[in-house]
Design a protein with these regions (language model features):
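Intrinsically disordered, low-complexity segments enriched in small/polar residues
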Residues: 17-21, 194, 347, 396
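Positively charged n-region of N-terminal signal peptides that target proteins for export
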Residues: 1-6, 643-645
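Intrinsic disorder/low-complexity segments
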Residues: 8-10, 29, 617
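Acidic, metal/ion-coordinating pockets
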Residues: 27-322, 447, 464
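Catalytic centers of hydrolytic enzymes
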Residues: 31-39, 46-60, 64-76, 111, ...
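Generic signature of intrinsically disordered, low-complexity, basic-rich segments
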Residues: 3-7, 24, 265, 398-404
């Protein structure tokens, strides 16, 4: 009997210890717990619905007013629904221009009923003071706001080194807003801990971010241990701005799930991924619904007997024009949008809904900029706009622009058929700020040698298939490349074209006038570092001196910077009014391509090896040396074997 009692006591203690270790245990006699979750990420200031092109079809999609309708319908069926957002809620439309004063995006997330969000890299676009001002403005509004979590900010390291002014601003704003490593929410009978993670690639994509961060997995593991120790929760969820990639070895949120297996659900933002089915990594479910509020993610989960959760249903609900917009939500969006006209567009003499041009041309979609390595008409019209605006600005000294450069990574939306408004043009190029502190990257004027221009073409030809944001579209320079040739030696022809279309050979040592946006100028200037010194592109002044601060070379239009989006708007307005209705018409010129970028797919051996540049010669030389070393090793081994015989 004593032995039986001891055995029972031992078993009881063992079960308690196991329950304590796992943090999860469900009483088999109880009904299993159930939770409905709605999620978004990468909304990028898309408060209003918008026209875009999807699979070659023009569609109206998105909009917080339609999202609100879907959320209301879901909450009628289950009032205890958890709503999560994966960050990058800002930067992408005109509403971002009042980011730091109105905090429109965060306030509207609160209005939707979002429970928890996190920070993405684009929340840092306006610098430390911009983020701090936005958080403070959100609190000052007095409105309902989502809780904000991020667990891997390394405050200890920053305190030890001494706060910079920007770090101090954000630290104080975090305290004011109540940003935490994690938060605990009760939904019906389900208690959920939600932590936030800021990914490694997000940090790489946030050049203005002054904060220091811990390794995401290590910080998440520590936070989960703290949750298990201090909170009696049923589920651990994570809003992560890290993303997923096709290559599982570098897919950050899949790595997070492997390294921190006690996380039940990861809402994965940053990479704009649209997952038709969740990614399952052990007992962790990873979900993504795509960008701009085009879809509302929904997942229903049930707790298993071991305390972990399984998916019952999962759906990405398209936010289409078939969904009725919630009127109260749209009214609030309109009120916030009105501040854009007053506080921002008045600086440029525009209004949000002003029509710039009528368009009958079918421009390529954004996705085609990733999938097609060729000339595209959207790149053509934007690069042509740069040339036009700079040559016609009030501060122009009459010098012609030789080349304008537009990378795919700076283009944020396409132009649809119908009226093109100021808002649509701004949304197509909505990134950054200038030295003047106003939203929008300015155009910069610089000089490159002919040799560097050819290198620009080679960046597109050799690198952009690995990094599609580096797909380059040029006005004034045409080139042909062969994708089958050796890397950094793919361009077979490169020349300039004037307004008359005549071919002009590029002289390697001559300086050429180049116009691009500030972001691209910085990107081209960093090519030397990114390529480990293999290739070099150094923006210069007209005397050939390297430019140290590109902001000082912004193109000015009177007393204000010429913003890239404003250059496009000016160009649109310059088109001929062909139907005589008082509004410009996009010309038929853009209905086709003009051999600006030509892919020569020849596999003829002569075409593949002719005209090798220094990179090809070096690579071939290395190959010959390597083969020689291998042959010497083989010869030596054979000689040794023969001696032993």
């Amino acid at each position: 009997m004593k032995l039986l009692k001891k055995a029972f006591a031992f078993t009881f203690i063992f079960m308690l210890s196991v329950s304590g270790l796992t943090g999860y245990q469900v009483n088999a006699s109880e009904e299993p717990k159930h939770l409905d979750i709605l999620f978004t990420h990468d909304l990028h200031s898309h408060l209003n619905s918008f026209q875009t092109i999807v699979d070659g079809t023009q569609q109206e999609t998105g909009g917080f007013a339609r999202l609100k309708t879907l959320i209301n319908e879901h909450e009628k069926e289950n009032t205890d629904t958890l709503i999560l957002d994966g960050g990058d809620f800002s930067m992408g439309t005109l509403i971002q221009t009042v980011y730091d004063t109105e905090a429109a995006e965060l306030r509207m997330l609160g209005y939707l009923g979002c429970d928890v969000t996190t920070l993405g890299n684009h929340e840092f676009d306006y610098g430390s003071d911009g983020l701090a001002d936005m958080l403070n403005a959100a609190v000052s509004s007095g409105e309902n706001l989502p809780r904000m979590v991020v667990c891997n900010v390394d405050w200890d390291a920053m305190k030890k080194a001494g706060f910079s002014e920007g770090q101090k601003q954000i630290y104080e704003a975090f305290q004011t807003y109540g940003v935490k490593d994690y938060t605990v929410i009760q939904k019906g009978d389900v208690k959920i801990a939600v932590l936030g993670v800021f990914g490694k690639d997000s940090l790489d994509c946030a050049p203005t971010c002054e904060l220091l961060f811990k390794d995401p997995s290590e910080a998440a593991r520590e936070t989960v241990e703290e949750i298990k120790k201090n909170e009696d929760v049923d589920m651990i969820a994570c809003v992560s701005h890290s993303g997923t990639w096709e290559d599982e070895k570098v897919s950050e949120d899949e790595i997070l799930a492997k390294n921190v297996p006690d996380i039940d659900l990861i809402v994965s933002g940053h990479t704009h991924t649209q997952l038709a089915e969740p990614i399952l990594q052990g007992d962790t479910c990873i979900v993504s619904c795509g960008e701009y509020g085009k879809n509302l993610g929904t997942i229903s989960m049930t707790q298993k007997e071991n305390g972990r959760w399984e998916t019952d249903t999962y759906e990405l609900v398209p936010v289409t024009d078939e969904i009725k917009a919630d009127e109260a939500t749209q009214k609030k969006i309109d009120e916030l949008s009105d501040t854009v006209d007053t506080n921002y567009l008045s600086n440029f003499g525009y209004t949000r809904e002003e029509i710039l041009a009528e368009n009958d041309i079918e421009f390529n979609s954004l996705s085609e900029m990733e999938t097609k390595h060729e000339e595209l008409n959207l790149g053509d019209i934007i690069s042509d706009a740069y040339v036009y605006a700079v040559e016609n600005t009030g501060d122009s000294d009459g010098e012609k622009v030789d080349v304008a450069i537009v990378p795919a990574g700076t283009v944020r939306d396409t132009y649809t058929k119908g009226n093109i408004t100021v808002e649509q043009v701004y949304n197509s190029f909505s990134l950054g700020t200038g030295k003047d502190g106003l939203a929008g990257y300015p155009l910069i004027s610089a000089y490159l040698t002919g040799k560097e221009l050819k290198t620009v073409a080679e960046v597109d030809a050799s690198i952009s298939d690995f990094m599609t944001i580096a797909r380059l579209y040029c006005s004034g320079m045409n080139f042909t490349y062969n994708p089958h040739r050796m890397i950094l030696n793919k361009v077979t022809d490169c020349y300039l074209t004037g307004k008359d279309g005549e071919r002009e050979e590029i002289q390697d040592d001559k300086l050429y006038h180049v116009v691009t946006d500030l972001y691209t100028g910085r990107m081209l200037g960093s090519v030397l570092d990114k390529s480990y010194g293999l290739i070099s592109i150094v923006p210069k002044d007209k005397n050939g001196n390297p430019i140290e601060n590109l902001e000082d070379y912004a193109v000015m239009d009177g007393k204000k910077e010429l913003k890239a989006w404003a250059a496009i708007a000016e160009y649109m307005q310059s088109f001929e009014d062909t139907d005589k209705d008082g509004i410009a018409n996009v010309p038929e010129y853009y209905d086709t391509t003009h051999e600006r970028k030509v892919a020569d797919n020849s596999k003829n051996i002569i075409n593949l090896v002719k005209h090798p540049n220094k990179f090809a010669v070096a690579i071939v030389g290395i190959g010959i040396v390597a083969v020689g070393v291998i042959l010497l090793l083989i010869f030596g081994i054979v000689k040794i074997i023969r001696r032993r015989r």
